UniProtKB/Swiss-Prot annotation:
It is found in: Vacuole membrane. InterPro entries: ARM-like, ARM-type_fold, Armadillo, Vac8. This is Vacuolar protein 8. Belongs to the beta-catenin family. The keyword Ribosomal protein does not apply. It comes from Cryptococcus neoformans var. neoformans serotype D (strain JEC21 / ATCC MYA-565) (Filobasidiella neoformans). One of its GO terms (cellular component) is nuclear membrane.
Length: 630
């Protein structure tokens, strides 16, 4: 229609057609006034009302364009619906006007229409981004404000984000985020936030120079701007490369976020904690959060009655607790009781998982901290809950118990609490992780547990078939790691030299049959196997340290054979057809590096030789959650 008007107004035919054109415009004005008087019953997005608006939009008369733009803005303010190209074309034409009033009203109308999801896509597909970018560069603040607001709405649709990022809009958006006009600043930071939901767009945003602008605006007096910037930075911090850039260029970021956890706005507090949580994926930030006073506000948020605050704080503390240097500061700051209380927070299993994982992290490397966690009542709470919580929480709880059970000083106390009564049923859980963690915890408890092994005898046949049924299941498992932990656990129980335990094991035909079957398997060669830590090398770490290389399948099978034969020796039943003339407890060499007994090695199961220390570590790392999160 624009080209038709141009031809109608050409000099050659001006006198013939100008009166007709002006009459058409006058009729459109009259019609529009009538429609506006009856707006409650008029559909402006079709038929004659839309035709009248279209005529005025494509007029060369700026006053008529203003009328059309203002009408579109007013109509779309009251009613938003999915529209077609016949509605968007005149609005987009008005958007290209050189008149600031027309630009302002047209961008307001387009922003209103862009609330509808289908309209968002159509605006972009019809080329709406280019005139909006031009308007963002306008010196008129009102025009800037509406154009940025429209971009913000368009950017909420995932299919538009990439096109917006590639359109050249990010640089002017970043510049306008520093506007002195709070409305423009608010819209611009909101648009930048909407562009942080994919890795590709985040990288383009960082390239556009958004990071220093977003960080500087954390100190904005406007709550919405604080929220948008905090959330945008939280999303940006998901990427390791971006965290590195933040660490290099923004030394005051952590302090600003810690301060925002004390904001008057709950949503700002929440996002500040989440931003710190994402930053705390890196050890540098884990330490900085503690250094700059982050624990106090995090503890306060844990005590909140508002779920999003509890969840964000729990997630943040979990990551902060990963660093060994933070274990004691967290405990000394009073986190144990609130974390233990959150174990029963059945409104949200994610909160429960974060709480128990934090406790596991805090217990990872310090005997003192393990003792403090048990003394604070964590084990009693776990025992009361673990059979009824969701599987994900069970997995974390059993992993935590397995870590606590590594402490020789705590084993008698844990056994006295009756922890085996809940661990045994969980070895038959539908979750492989829960099975493994529970078995690892039982294995840890069985090693050097105490002189009194009565707690193990008490659960030999119950609950759920007891320790006996669990060992039978694991010995016959297709998973060699499960076989491994079962035979290792039996060795620990036998080496306790408890008469009743030994008789229980010896008098179980199915148990002995399974052991004999495992003992018959020929140990594999280590040829071609991966190198392992030298068990006699102190730098390789103790049995509670991380055993990074672990065992190959062949090595694991060799260890199982050695341990199974050791069990037969300790029970004095022997392999079928073999003669065992020596008594249990003799110094029997255990296969080292996957070799069979009797090949010159001197490690002894009875003294928990270094080879089995490495074995123990590998099993614990594989099954017990072996310490802290990563």
């Amino acid at each position: 229609m624009g080209s038709a008007l141009s031809s109608c107004c050409s000099p050659r035919r001006k006198n013939a057609y100008e009166p007709l054109l002006l009459e058409t415009e006058r009729e459109a004005v009259a019609d529009l006034l009538q429609y506006l008087e009856n707006r409650s019953t008029t559909n402006f997005f079709a038929g004659s009302p839309l035709a009248a608006l279209t005529t005025l939009s494509f007029s060369e008369n700026v006053d008529l364009q203003r009328s059309a733009a203002l009408a579109f803005a007013e109509i779309t303010e009251k009613e938003v619906r999915e529209v077609g190209r016949d509605t968007l074309d005149p609005v987009l034409y008005l958007l290209s006007s050189h008149d600031p009033e027309v630009q302002r009203a047209a961008s307001a109308a387009l922003g209103n229409l862009a609330v509808n999801a289908e309209n968002k896509l159509l605006v972009v597909s019809l080329g709406g981004l280019e005139p909006l970018i031009r308007q963002m560069l306008s010196p008129n603040v009102e025009v800037q404000c509406n154009a940025v607001g429209c971009i913000t709405n368009l950017a909420t649709h995932d299919e538009n984000k990439t096109q917006i990022a590639k359109s050249g809009a990010l640089v002017p958006l970043t510049r306008l985020a520093k506007s002195k006009d709070m409305r423009v600043q608010r819209n611009a930071t909101g648009a930048l936030l909407n562009m942080t939901h994919s890795d590709e767009n985040r990288q383009q945003l960082v390239a556009a120079g958004a990071i220093p602008v977003l960080v500087s605006l954390l100190n904005s007096p406007d709550t919405d701007v604080q929220y948008y910037c905090t959330t945008a930075l939280s999303n940006i911090a998901v990427d390791a490369a971006n965290r590195k850039k933040l660490a290099q260029s923004e030394p005051k970021l952590v302090q600003s976020l810690v301060q925002l956890m004390d904001s008057q706005s709950l949503k700002v507090q929440c996002q500040a904690a989440l931003a710190l949580r994402n930053l705390a994926s890196d050890s540098k930030y884990q330490l900085e959060i503690v250094k700059f006073g982050g624990l106090k506000p995090l503890l306060r948020l844990l005590h909140s009655s508002y779920l999003p605050l509890i969840l964000s704080a729990a997630a943040c503390v979990r990551n902060v607790s990963i660093h060994p240097a933070n274990e004691s500061p967290i405990i000394e700051s009073g986190f144990l009781q609130p974390l233990i209380e959150l174990l029963s927070f059945d409104e949200n299993e994610e909160v429960q998982c974060h709480a128990i994982s934090t406790l596991r992290n805090l217990a990872a490397s310090s005997e003192k901290n393990k003792g403090a966690i048990v003394e604070a009542g964590a084990v009693e709470k776990i025992k009361s809950l673990v059979l009824t919580v969701p599987l994900a929480v069970q997995s974390e709880m059993t992993a935590c118990v397995a870590v606590l059970a590594l402490s020789d000083d705590l084993k008698p106390q844990l056994l006295e609490m009756g922890i085996c009564e809940v661990l045994i049923p969980l070895t038959n859980s539908p979750s492989v992780e829960v099975q493994g963690n529970s078995a690892a915890a039982l294995g840890n408890l069985s090693s050097k547990a105490a002189e009194d092994y009565a707690p193990f005898n008490a659960v030999w046949n119950k609950p759920d078939g007891g320790l006996h049924a669990y060992l039978v299941r694991f010995l016959s498992s297709a998973d060699i790691t499960f076989q491994h932990i079962a035979v290792w656990t039996i060795v620990q129980l036998l080496e306790a030299e408890d008469e009743q335990l030994t008789n229980n094991i010896r008098s179980s035909p199915i148990l002995i049959s399974s052991i004999r079957q495992l003992a018959k398997s020929p140990p594999p060669s280590r040829a071609g196997g991966a190198p392992r830590h030298d068990p006699n090398d102190p730098s390789a770490g103790s049995s509670e340290d991380e055993f990074e290389d672990g065992l190959t399948d062949q090595e694991g099978e060799g260890e199982i054979v050695s341990l199974a034969r050791r069990i037969l020796d300790l029970t004095e039943v022997g392999e079928e057809g073999d003669e065992f003339g020596e008594r249990a407890g003799r110094n029997v060499p255990v296969g080292s590096h996957g070799q069979a007994p009797g090949q010159g090695q001197t490690s002894q199961v009875g003294s928990m030789g270094s080879e089995h220390a490495a074995l123990r570590a590998s099993v614990h790392r594989a099954l017990s959650g072996g310490g802290r999160d990563r």
